[in-house]
């Protein structure tokens, strides 16, 4: 096993155990909302400190960027850890058992290692660039679905993307016309992992946050999936819109989207 991957897995599992303990306490926490917010803030602080301490114990020269507190610890720009201590925070806050810990390791500006850990289901998704994606040690591949009809589609609403909202419901109607089943899970990292291992056929994300997506994107690519914007290009980081699926299904969807908007997408 890659030595950095081994440390990333240890970090994810350790924080997963902490999350479970807090989750059990949160289920019996009936305090007022403001006190609950303080409780969540404390959890994030504990998790991020644990992750940073564990990483720097093994790799003191590595840089770290955290999502929730936006901590940026720059020591070595060659290797950067992007850590999201709790992806699916709203689910956690409302006792919905669908959240995870997400880690991406960037080496010379390229994502080389990804770890996504779901402590509720004890599912560990790992990827190493050029070596594939795995779930609990078993190889993952995207589904080979080549039709939209009755497919299962993950969906992220474009709440911060007013430009895309003009297209959103039109595309949703297109999906409904093919009898697709939509799932809005509230956890983008697990959405990506689920496409990578075939639980979801396709993911339609109109609210891309690059720091949240780095780990999931490697899982997708290493399981044979494709990522594109609405035009079939790779401008999804600047546009904030991503389409994810296997190559056959992606071709079908992109053709239908082009027909729908008559090549007027910008």
Curated annotation (Swiss-Prot):
State one molecular function term (GO): inositol monophosphate 1-phosphatase activity
Pfam families from the xrefs?
Answer: Inositol_P
From what superkingdom does this record's organism come? Bacteria
Q: Which UniProt keywords apply?
A: Chaperone, Cytoplasm, Hydrolase, Ribosome biogenesis, RNA-binding, Transcription, Transcription antitermination, Transcription regulation
Subcellular location(s) of the protein: Cytoplasm
Q: Where does substrate bind?
A: 86-89
Which cofactors, by name? Mg(2+)
Q: What is its main location?
A: cytoplasm
List GO BP terms, alphabetically. inositol metabolic process; ribosome biogenesis; signal transduction; transcription antitermination
Query: A single GO CC term, please?
Result: cytoplasm
- This entry's Enzyme Commission designation comes to 3.1.3.25
InterPro entries cross-referenced by the UniProt entry: IMPase, Inositol_monophosphatase-like
- Where, if anywhere, are coiled coils annotated? none
Question: Catalysed reaction(s)?
Answer: a myo-inositol phosphate + H2O = myo-inositol + phosphate
Summarizing the function annotation, the protein's role is:
Part of the processive rRNA transcription and antitermination complex (rrnTAC). The complex forms an RNA-chaperone ring around the RNA exit tunnel of RNA polymerase (RNAP). It supports rapid transcription and antitermination of rRNA operons, cotranscriptional rRNA folding, and annealing of distal rRNA regions to allow correct ribosome biogenesis. This subunit may play a central role in organizing the structure.
The annotated subunit structure for this chain is: Homodimer. The rRNA transcription and antitermination complex (rrnTAC) consists of RNA polymerase (RNAP), NusA, NusB, NusE (rpsJ), NusG, SubB, ribosomal protein S4, DNA and precursor rRNA; S4 is more flexible than other subunits.
Which family does the record claim for this protein? Belongs to the inositol monophosphatase superfamily.
Protein name stated in the entry: Nus factor SuhB
Species this protein is from? Buchnera aphidicola subsp. Baizongia pistaciae (strain Bp)
Report which gene this protein is encoded by: suhB
């Amino acid at each position: 096993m890659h030595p950095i991957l081994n440390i990333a897995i240890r970090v994810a599992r350790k924080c997963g155990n902490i999350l479970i303990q807090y989750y059990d306490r949160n289920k019996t926490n009936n305090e007022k909302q403001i006190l609950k917010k303080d409780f969540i803030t404390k959890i994030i602080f504990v998790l991020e400190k644990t992750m940073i301490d564990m990483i720097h114990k093994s790799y003191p020269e590595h840089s770290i960027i955290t999502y929730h507190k936006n901590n940026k610890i720059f020591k070595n720009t060659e290797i950067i850890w992007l850590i999201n201590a709790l992806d699916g925070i709203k689910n956690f806050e409302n006792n919905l058992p669908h959240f995870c810990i997400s880690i991406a390791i960037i080496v010379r500006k390229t994502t080389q290692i990804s770890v996504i850990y779901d402590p509720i289901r004890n599912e560990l998704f790992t990827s190493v660039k050029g070596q594939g994606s795995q779930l609990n040690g078993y190889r993952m591949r995207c589904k080979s679905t080549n039709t939209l009809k009755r497919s299962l589609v993950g969906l992220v609403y474009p709440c911060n993307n007013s430009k895309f909202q003009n297209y959103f419901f039109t595309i949703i109607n297109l999906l409904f016309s093919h009898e697709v089943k939509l799932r809005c899970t509230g956890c983008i990292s697990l959405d990506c992992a689920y496409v990578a291992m075939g639980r979801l056929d396709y993911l339609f994300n109109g609210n891309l946050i690059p720091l949240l997506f780095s780990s999931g994107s490697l899982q997708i690519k290493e399981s044979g999936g494709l990522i594109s914007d609405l035009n079939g290009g790779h401008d999804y980081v600047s546009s904030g819109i991503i389409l994810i699926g296997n190559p056959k299904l992606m071709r079908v969807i992109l053709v239908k989207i082009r027909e729908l908007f008559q090549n007027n997408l910008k």
